[in-house]
Amino acid sequence: MKKLITLVASLLAVALLTVPVFAAENQSLAVDITKISISNEANNDLLNAATESSPVNGTRITTWDNTGHATQRRDYSESVPGKPQHYWLKNSANRSYAVTCYGTDGQQVTLQSFTRNMTTQPVKFINEGGSSFNIYGLANTTYILALTTTGSYNGAPVLWKGSNNQNNQLWVLGAWG
């Protein structure tokens, strides 16, 4: 009987290990890190808080070459309760501010005071697969809009836009540090 239990436990462990990491929509991110860099699939530029110091309310989000500054890091360690795959994207240079969407197509992405606002602050990470499991679409599901870069130059605005099936809406998550 002891051998049978051991065999069943072993088979169950093997079966669980063979399930793909992203098999279920409700799983959390594959990599459990608290600080990430987010670069655009189209041009490798990083999400960037457009400031030379610490972000404040209303700081615009742009894309920029890697400068190594904390304004290009995001903290996503806090998942949104009851909303699988949703995270608050706080800026590492000042964690009092989070990425916010106000719901209009073409709205400039900004940082606003982090309030745990369930409508305008959660960002959903949608695995897009591709050649890497770290490629995601970032969406505000309340308004069905995707995080979109508008160009491949330093300071290119990042907007919330409807899905366009282009790689300017795909983002690569990387460990920072």
Task: Describe the residue ranges of each PLM region.
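Sec-dependent N-terminal signal peptides of Gram-positive bacterial secreted proteins and lipoproteins
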Residues: 2-22
